[in-house]
Amino acid sequence: MTLALGIDPGTATTGYGLVRLAPDGGLVAVNYGVILTPKDATAPARLVMLYDQLRDLINEYHPEIAAVEKLFFSRNVTTALAVGQARGVVMLCLEQSGIE
């Protein structure tokens, strides 16, 4: 059964959920939660923490596929840029892990 990882990226809080297809065609939640980074850490350090924690999650559950929330237009450019950086780190981690 295929295990899918869904990710809602952010620098302070990145949400995730792992679901598996059930025999009846429905979805079964396997795990869900958030990856948190400390507010007092530098931006580069927070991105490294995000990468490391996401890699640990991938190594524990071995999802086959993933979906990452796309950016939406934000009035706060600083926030939009930070979320874009987090999304890039997530996409890098997924690619290096061989996840579609």
Specify the residue positions occupied by each region the protein language model found.
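Phosphate- and other anionic-substrate recognition elements at nucleic-acid/protein interfaces
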Residues: M1-E100
